[in-house]
């Protein structure tokens, strides 16, 4: 580990817990990333793609009718307006450019809700890279529009039937594939988790979210918000929002994990507040485990939050008290999903609806003028069938 250029740990969390065969690939990736950070032509191409292909900067929208409290302004950072429909596009373009820089011809990715898969497929189509996406068979079934989109853009979608047939199993299969193909392929990890240097790379390619938010809120309000709020699965949209505010100690950072059917039911995906530290997916991080240390299945109505661990920087921010992590249940997220649609004409992703649900809860408790910014990490087109079935009583 001595030859590493960046610190692989955030406090006690993170690291590079991978088979020896993958260490050279991760070191090569780290070197390429460090060089790209100071390469003006790389940064110019990345910025150009974000602006002229993905559509940045995204809007910061003040909600007109949503806030339950006249003293509270709720702003939405509109990552749902990004090409591809979610924040995922930011860092995927960055990593795909990095892969090309390293001379890789193929991209391997995993996806849960399908948003990262779609973002990877569009970046590969744009940049002329071959694309393979691993997706849990359950997620393939519940996210058929995104599966079609990926295939339409030329990606090969591989359903994973092992384990719980969800995101963690797709992660394992993608990592296994990469172990045998890293000389020609880049593993384009979809969240700010996994082995070093992925948590750092993903944060840096997502930090544009918080940078824009800071600039926009200062223009609109002349001050920083009281809190920024984002949903947390692996944690990439949240770390992208938080990164530029970490040193602004007057701004509260609030991550919202999925409480599923309720924290006390074990049917949830809240390892940060209710898990134990373990080794998973190449990193040391909080993990949902049973009493024997076996990984417990996570659960959330939203496929993108259905993950039994969390990125190491979030674990560290929680440990040092810089960020606070709450949770919202399926029912609260569904309520917020419908409320935003009815009040503002915006349909959020179910993932983002968790952050919104907590913001609404917080707004009701505020007793002074307060500005809240919610990262609306994605749009809800992919979730309309799931929500429709639930509201029509077709699912339990």
UniProtKB/Swiss-Prot annotation:
For biological process, the GO terms are: L-tryptophan biosynthetic process
| One family name in Pfam for this protein | PALP
Q: Name a GO molecular-function annotation.
A: tryptophan synthase activity
User: SUPFAM superfamilies, per this entry?
Assistant: Tryptophan synthase beta subunit-like PLP-dependent enzymes
**Record pathway:** Amino-acid biosynthesis; L-tryptophan biosynthesis; L-tryptophan from chorismate: step 5/5
Q: Which Gene3D superfamilies match?
A: 3.40.50.1100
Q: Does the keyword Amino-acid biosynthesis apply?
A: yes
Please name every pair of cysteines joined by a disulfide bond in this record: none
Question: Which residue spans traverse the membrane?
Answer: none
Checking CDD domains in the record gives:
Trp-synth_B
Gene Ontology cellular-component terms for this entry are: cytoplasm
Isomerase keyword on record: no
Name the needed cofactors.
pyridoxal 5'-phosphate
Q: What is its EC number?
A: 4.2.1.20
Output the InterPro entries linked to this UniProt entry. Trp_synth_b_CS, Trp_synth_beta, Trp_synth_beta/beta-like, TrpB-like_PALP, TrpB-like_PALP_sf
Function recorded in the entry: The beta subunit is responsible for the synthesis of L-tryptophan from indole and L-serine.
Description of how the protein assembles with itself and partners: Tetramer of two alpha and two beta chains.
From the Swiss-Prot or TrEMBL record, give the protein name: Tryptophan synthase beta chain
Q: Which organism is it from?
A: Shewanella oneidensis (strain ATCC 700550 / JCM 31522 / CIP 106686 / LMG 19005 / NCIMB 14063 / MR-1)
């Amino acid at each position: 580990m001595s030859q590493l250029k960046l610190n692989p740990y955030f406090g006690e969390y993170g690291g590079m817990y991978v088979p020896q065969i993958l260490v050279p690939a991760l070191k090569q990736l780290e070197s390429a990333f460090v060089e790209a950070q100071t390469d003006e032509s790389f940064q110019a191409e990345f910025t150009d793609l974000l602006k002229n292909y993905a559509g940045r900067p995204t809007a910061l929208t003040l909600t007109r009718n949503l806030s339950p409290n006249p003293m509270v302004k709720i702003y939405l950072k509109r990552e749902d307006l990004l090409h591809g429909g979610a924040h995922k596009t930011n860092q995927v373009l960055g990593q795909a450019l990095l892969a090309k820089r390293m001379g890789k011809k193929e991209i391997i990715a995993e996806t849960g809700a399908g948003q990262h898969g779609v973002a990877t497929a569009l970046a590969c189509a744009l940049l002329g890279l071959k694309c393979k996406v691993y997706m849990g068979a359950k997620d393939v079934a519940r996210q058929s529009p995104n599966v079609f989109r990926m295939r339409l853009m030329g990606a090969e979608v591989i359903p994973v039937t092992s384990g719980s047939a969800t995101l963690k199993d797709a992660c394992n299969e993608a990592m296994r594939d990469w172990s045998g193909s890293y000389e020609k392929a880049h593993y384009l990890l979809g969240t700010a988790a996994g082995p070093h240097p992925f948590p750092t790379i993903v944060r840096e390619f997502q930090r544009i979210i918080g940078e824009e938010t800071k600039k926009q809120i200062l223009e609109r309000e002349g001050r920083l918000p009281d809190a920024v709020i984002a949903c947390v699965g692996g944690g990439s949209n949240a770390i992208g929002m938080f990164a530029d505010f970490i040193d602004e100690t007057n701004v509260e950072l609030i991550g919202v994990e999925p409480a599923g059917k309720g924290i006390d039911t074990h049917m949830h995906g809240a390892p940060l507040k209710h898990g134990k530290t373990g080794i998973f997916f190449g990193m040391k991080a909080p993990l949902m485990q049973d009493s024997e240390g076996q990984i417990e299945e996570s659960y959330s109505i939203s496929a993108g939050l259905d993950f039994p661990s969390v990125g190491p920087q979030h674990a560290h921010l929680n440990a040092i008290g810089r960020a606070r992590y709450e949770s919202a249940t399926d029912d609260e997220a569904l309520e917020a999903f419908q409320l935003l649609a009815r009040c503002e004409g915006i349909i959020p992703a179910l993932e983002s609806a968790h952050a919104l649900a907590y913001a609404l809860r917080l707004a009701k408790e505020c007793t002074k003028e307060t500005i809240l910014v919610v990262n609306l990490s994605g749009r809800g087109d992919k979730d309309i069938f799931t929500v429709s079935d639930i509201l029509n009583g077709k699912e339990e």
